[in-house]
Swiss-Prot record:
InterPro entries reported for this sequence: Class_I_gatase-like (IPR029062), CobQ/CobB/MinD/ParA_Nub-bd_dom (IPR002586), CobQ_GATase1 (IPR033949), CobQ_N (IPR047045), CobQ_synth (IPR004459), GATase_3 (IPR011698), P-loop_NTPase (IPR027417)
Protein keywords: Cobalamin biosynthesis, Glutamine amidotransferase
Taxonomic source organism: Alkaliphilus metalliredigens (strain QYMF)
Active site: C326, H439
Domain GATase cobBQ-type: 245-447
Pathway this chain belongs to: Cofactor biosynthesis; adenosylcobalamin biosynthesis
Protein name in the entry: Cobyric acid synthase
GO function terms (MF aspect): ABC-type vitamin B12 transporter activity; catalytic activity
HAMAP family: CobQ (MF_00028)
Amino acid sequence: MVQGTASSVGKSLLTAALCRIFNEDGYRVVPFKSQNMALNSFVTEEGLEMGRAQVFQAEAARIKPQVKMNPILLKPTADSHAQVIIQGAVHGNMTAQEYHQFKPQLKSMLRDIYLDLETSNDIVVIEGAGSPAEINLRDQDIVNMGMAEIADSPVILVGDIDRGGVFASLYGTIMLLEESERSRVKGILINKFRGDLKILEPGLKMLEELINIPVIGVIPYERFDIEDEDSLSDRLQQKNHQESDISIAIIRLPHISNFTDFHLLEQMEGVNVNYIGRNQSIGRPDMIIIPGSKNTIGDLKYLQEVGLAAEIIEVHKTGTMICGICGGYQMLGNRILDPNHVESPEGEIQGLGLLDVETNFESEKVTTQVSGKILDHKLLEEIECGGIEVKGYEIHMGRTLRGATIKPFVKIEERLSKPVDDFDGAINEAGTVFGTYLHGIFDEISLVEKIINGLLMKKGLPTIQQRNCSLEELKDREYSRLAKVVRENIDMKYIYKILEGEA
């Protein structure tokens, strides 16, 4: 089990690295995280919802994501409130206190799921959450030492040296553990190291003497193009000042969800992706994207209050391309109705009015994988997108109805692997504004290249050459690069001793 001294120390990436290493060594390996708190989620082939961290870890292990890899998903909806998703389905909304009291009821389920994974695989790599030293949560813990006890798992503790204070955080974490918990920790990993290892080594020896646990690796600081939750969160706080031919502004909503949708856009050469939030001007980008939201009405009110809604409408008048995904699509419409107060105490809110659609919130959540083709449309009246095959997944509570004159954007041909005859999204007559419920639509490189090249042509600039590999191939290369870096800087012989119970 991989635990850390705090959030964002690199647990998710190291779990993925171990999954790829064990896979390369010929083992059947599966990732597992009992409880994930995130707004980035994924829908499986069965239409079940799970955290994206276990999705990229499954990809690293070269297996399909399954909801039992992440049986509990918490999606914050407001301060101290979250939607609780158990085994891929919505259980209900709870306050932090309500969920804390509810957790003991989940232990038997976690035990059964873990045993199922253990019996059908050679190795289960478990990821913890935050820190195991949250002593106020120890009695009801099901994600750190509580999960280690359920699985009877040895633990590797990870510290982030890049933030400073790594020795204090590692020592303090170990000292705050109970003796039975401390005995589970078989090794220490130092992550995100920059500098001369020889200067660090005396400190490692002193730490080992203090805690009587070996340091089994020092992982160098390295950036990877992987949809890891922590690195994505960091990117939301950054503003890219690099010069580029194409500028894309993504609105940083307070409850932004599934910002993994923009991974490929961020990888495109000559494209500058900026996340625009409070006290920032949108400027004059080539494209604006309003992403998904876990609190669509609340985030739309936020856009109106901080002036971003008015700015989006003004930029629209210049002919700039605007796209909305899921909650962003709903915001582009005329209004959003919530008569049953599924999401908000308010029953209605006016939208941006850029698409002739109207959304009605319903209590039943839609979670489904879909595939289809973009209809015969021209974005900006020039970019031919008709016939491009797209696939993705829907996660939403609302139903959106198009006005009499507006056209759908995508022809849905398959839903949950079954043929259907349906439509998704909407696009205006000029091709300047479109919306869709499909998360993952911008993972389709043909569509992304069409849009980028169309924007380049509009500015009289040379177009980019088409890539010869898919996003899946690009990610697979990164998983292998990640595994190589970790394998070269960790004592894998000792890791296998831990697995054999010899450490």
